[in-house]
A protein has these predicted regions:
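C-terminal single-pass membrane-anchor helix
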Residues: 21-34, 233-294
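Secondary-structure boundary elements
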Residues: 32-101
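Membrane-proximal basic amphipathic "stem/tether" segments
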Residues: 2-17, 216-249, 277
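Linear, non-domain "peripheral" regions
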Residues: 1-53, 293
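Short flexible/disordered coil segments
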Residues: 2-11, 19-22, 139, 143-147, ...
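Extracytoplasmic/lumenal ectodomains and periplasmic regions of secretory and membrane proteins
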Residues: 156-158, 162-234
Length: 294
């Protein structure tokens, strides 16, 4: 009788584990779908605005320049304190479009708008030294099989003089960034914002798209990537890291999968325990009977 009751409790526990897993999975999935739809609506707005800005332009470099120029003139430059659900994730690109922001906020908007029209772009963080903290953020975007840097806080790009533009790797270890600042300061009025730009904002010696030294996880990822022949320093910063809605939607999708599989595995584990208990009891009873007969 005790064995039957124990098996019954284990059976119901397994059933509840599965149901709890499915319920958690269903809730997470619904939230993920809602977030994805909200992100998609934002994406439509960004794409429409970016297409309007670049309507008559024929090259990606011209489109990148135009979007950067538009974001520079859109709203103010104070840090955007808005956020979506989690303050640590910062504002969404739409929130930056509505209220402006600092270098990281406006760079987030530029990258999102460029990605929405099919131009690969990502944020790049600038540091004054190898072990120093990050002091500025810009955007690096791909154009005609090359890359170019744009800065939506100072409205800067870095032309080569022959129709091309410079990317992070082209600017690193050179004085081209500082030379470009001096050039623009002479071209623009003395009252222009660029008159107050810190020199370090245009130095790319320690600029990175990802802080690969952040922790053991990122360091391991770098090791694995290099082991497989990849060069992480050439990767664009993942888009989901700069879009809170997209990041949360993906995280909830992962939770959905884990909850569904986890509940099912717990039920299987409890059933396995149920199958083991009768065998042990049978063996124990057989030993007792053998001893009695003896």
């Amino acid at each position: 009788m005790k064995l039957v009751m124990r098996n019954r409790r284990l059976f119901h526990a397994g059933l509840w584990c599965r149901r709890a897993g499915w319920l958690t999975s269903a809730i997470s999935l619904l939230c993920a779908i809602a977030l994805f739809l909200s992100w998609h609506q934002d994406e439509v707005v960004l794409r429409q605005e970016a297409m309007a800005i670049t309507e008559n332009l024929n090259t990606d470099s011209a489109r990148i320049h135009a979007v950067n120029n538009w974001v520079y003139h859109n709203k103010g430059f104070a840090s955007n304190d808005r956020y979506f659900i989690l303050p640590a994730l910062g504002p969404t690109p739409i929130q930056v479009m509505e209220r402006g922001g600092d270098c990281s906020d406006k760079s987030r908007l530029v990258a999102a708008m460029l990605n929405s029209i099919g131009i690969h772009a990502g944020l790049v963080m600038i540091s004054p030294c190898l072990d120093c903290g990050f002091i500025h953020t810009v955007v690096e975007a791909q154009y005609e099989n090359r890359r170019m840097v744009v800065d939506p806080i100072w409205n800067i790009d870095y032309p080569t003089g022959d129709g091309g533009f410079l990317g992070v790797m082209d600017l690193a270890g050179t004085s081209r960034g500082r030379e470009r600042i001096v050039e623009l300061q002479h071209q623009r009025p003395a009252t222009d914002k660029i008159a107050s730009i810190p020199e370090m904002d245009a130095m790319f010696d320690y600029a990175v798209a990802m802080n690969w030294k952040k922790n053991i996880v990122t360091q391991t990822a770098v090791f694995i990537l290099r082991l497989n022949g990849y060069q992480p320093e050439f990767f664009f910063r993942p888009r989901l890291l700069e879009d809170p809605k997209l990041l949360l939607a993906i995280m909830l999708t992962i939770i959905t999968i884990i909850a569904a599989i986890g509940g099912y595995l717990l039920e299987i584990g409890l059933r396995f325990v149920m199958m083991r208990i009768p065998r042990r009891m049978t063996c124990s009873n057989a030993d007792k009977l053998g001893a009695t007969d003896g």
